[in-house]
């Protein structure tokens, strides 16, 4: 079992019950999934770019991503229908907690000029989104073998009903919020 999963069961859940006054342990917010999404617009011109993006995402997430394809053609962007334009991976269970642990303790401190993550990236329904500008903050990616710096979006989906509950949950997981 993952370290953060144990921490959630033993410390975080009881503290959230005390803070918000839940009557049932099933009301306590928890993280259900983490989705990593990488848009690769350069894949339109060069197919090898997509292979590199998929290999980077596999190293970061620990499982093979799904290649996302264009739903409809957009002439202005030179995109045809069913053309590969990105990749995504959904993490749940132990892999999710392992990724979260690596992200908070190892990857975030490696961001240049890091002063904390924004406290305004909640969606109003208890979910949180983080944009990462370059994939080299993850220790699994070797700097010398990177062909191009690519960003990715990390969506953390929780069972929290409000942004306040979600922020309390993520703060308990030691997310370094600004202010």
Swiss-Prot record:
Source taxon at top rank: Bacteria
One GO cellular component term noted in the UniProt record for this chain: ribosome
Ribonucleoprotein in keyword set: yes
GO BP term, example: translation
Keyword Zinc in annotation: no
UniProt KW keywords: Ribonucleoprotein, Ribosomal protein, RNA-binding, rRNA-binding, tRNA-binding
GO molecular function: rRNA binding; structural constituent of ribosome; tRNA binding
Pfam families in the record: Ribosomal_L5, Ribosomal_L5_C
Self-association and partners: Part of the 50S ribosomal subunit; part of the 5S rRNA/L5/L18/L25 subcomplex. Contacts the 5S rRNA and the P site tRNA. Forms a bridge to the 30S subunit in the 70S ribosome.
Homology family: Belongs to the universal ribosomal protein uL5 family.
Function: This is one of the proteins that bind and probably mediate the attachment of the 5S RNA into the large ribosomal subunit, where it forms part of the central protuberance. In the 70S ribosome it contacts protein S13 of the 30S subunit (bridge B1b), connecting the 2 subunits; this bridge is implicated in subunit movement. Contacts the P site tRNA; the 5S rRNA and some of its associated proteins might help stabilize positioning of ribosome-bound tRNAs.
Protein name: Large ribosomal subunit protein uL5
Organism: Polaromonas sp. (strain JS666 / ATCC BAA-500)
Name of the gene: rplE
